[in-house]
């Protein structure tokens, strides 16, 4: 468990959340265009609404708009790969939400939503893995590939100078949490 960050990191965390919520909103929209199970599509629609609300909340808090995209990001077309990507990014988002609530306890609803999102995708990943065979192997390969690309992504998220004294510890913590979750759900082995 990380120690709470000092108040000097508040704006940087809020700005990072603004970017992350914008990215999540676009990723969830793009995911809806893929071939996903019916129950997942319903969740993604609700998830999109929540992300849009979060985005507006952060825009108001910061007094700035997020940068709108003109095209949806490319998302994996295979559900087993898409589920791993969404689970991974939601796990990272959950850790940032925990950091945020350490600075802004009034934003606990963001943390609660992130816990629901992670729980949903964790359940979906477990469902995929219980199928065994090539489907489960494909999910594990996707997790390995996604995890290899994660350190530079987390480093970008922590680029703000206010994070400098904590950057290494934060990066180790976030990557460690992802590794623990991937191990616990069965996406990776030690």
PLM region descriptions:
Residues 1-190:
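Non-heme di-metal
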């Amino acid at each position: 468990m990380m120690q709470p960050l000092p108040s000097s990191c508040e704006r940087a965390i809020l700005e990072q959340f603004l970017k992350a919520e914008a990215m999540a909103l676009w990723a969830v929209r793009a995911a809806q265009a893929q071939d996903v199970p019916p129950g997942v599509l319903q969740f993604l629609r609700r998830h999109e609404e929540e992300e849009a609300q979060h985005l507006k909340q952060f825009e108001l808090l910061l007094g700035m708009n997020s940068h709108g995209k003109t095209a949806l990001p490319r998302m994996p077309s295979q559900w087993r790969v898409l589920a791993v990507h969404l689970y991974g990014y939601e796990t990272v988002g959950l850790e940032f939400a925990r950091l945020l609530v350490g600075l802004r306890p009034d934003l606990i609803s963001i943390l609660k939503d992130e816990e629901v999102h992670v729980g949903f995708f964790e359940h979906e990943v477990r469902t995929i893995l219980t199928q065994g065979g090539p489907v489960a192997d494909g999910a594990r390969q996707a997790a390995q590939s996604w995890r290899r690309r994660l350190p530079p992504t987390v480093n970008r998220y922590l680029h703000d100078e206010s994070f400098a004294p904590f950057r290494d510890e934060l990066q180790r913590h976030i990557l460690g949490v992802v590794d623990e979750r991937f191990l616990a759900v069965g996406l990776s082995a030690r």
